[in-house]
Amino acid sequence: MRRPNKAPPAASKDGPRINDDIRNAQIQLIDQTGDNKGTVETVVAIKMAQEAGMDLVEISPNTSPPVCKIMDYGKYKYSAQKKAAEARKRQKTVEIKEIKLRPMIDDHDYDVKMRAMQRFFEEGDKVKITLRYRGREMAHQEIGTKLLDKIKTDVAELAKVEQDARFEGRQVVMVLAPR
């Protein structure tokens, strides 16, 4: 049994409607210099755009009548793509940096880790502190708890605790986020 012939689905276009895609009988027209020409028939507006060597682009389709502008659509589309690319370039993704510690850390090593943490916060990144216990250190978990409390107080003006300290097997994990 044969299937009945179906028309292919209409391709949905991205962006505003231009020229003959505008279906309204009348539109609010803005010319290429930005002057408001008032309510004009769509056919006349398309003719005006073609005489100027430009396109009629629907700016605001939801108003009554829709607002259309005479402009170079290729140039408009190109500048919109450039703006979007620039916005993507400027957008910073927040990374989670990890700092690994041991409960019996020396003072100088602690200072080095704190400087690294401070640099991460200045860059706008979150910091995941992993405190790993080895061997008999598990019997003295209060040392690790004191160390994490000391870290919290030392970075209090730079960061806030996003996820409080919690055990994951033989390690304690805490996440700090910049203020």
UniProtKB/Swiss-Prot annotation:
Q: Give the superkingdom in one word.
A: Bacteria
Any GO MF annotation of the entry: ribosome binding
Gene3D superfamilies on file: Translation initiation factor 3 (IF-3), C-terminal domain, Translation initiation factor 3 (IF-3), N-terminal domain
**A Pfam family this protein belongs to?**
IF3_C
Positions the record marks as coiled coil are none
SUPFAM superfamilies annotated for this entry? Translation initiation factor IF3, C-terminal domain, Translation initiation factor IF3, N-terminal domain
An example Gene Ontology biological process: ribosome disassembly
Q: Which UniProt keywords apply?
A: Cytoplasm, Initiation factor, Protein biosynthesis
Instruction: Give the UniProt subcellular location, in the record's own words.
Output: Cytoplasm
What InterPro entries does UniProt report for this protein, alphabetically? T_IF-3_C_sf, T_IF-3_N_sf, Translation_initiation_fac_3, Translation_initiation_fac_3_C, Translation_initiation_fac_3_N
One Gene Ontology CC term in the entry? cytosol
Q: Which family does it belong to?
A: Belongs to the IF-3 family.
Q: What does this protein do?
A: IF-3 binds to the 30S ribosomal subunit and shifts the equilibrium between 70S ribosomes and their 50S and 30S subunits in favor of the free subunits, thus enhancing the availability of 30S subunits on which protein synthesis initiation begins.
The record, for HAMAP family, names: IF_3 (MF_00080)
**Quaternary structure note:** Monomer.
Q: What is this protein called?
A: Translation initiation factor IF-3
Q: Which organism is it from?
A: Bradyrhizobium diazoefficiens (strain JCM 10833 / BCRC 13528 / IAM 13628 / NBRC 14792 / USDA 110)
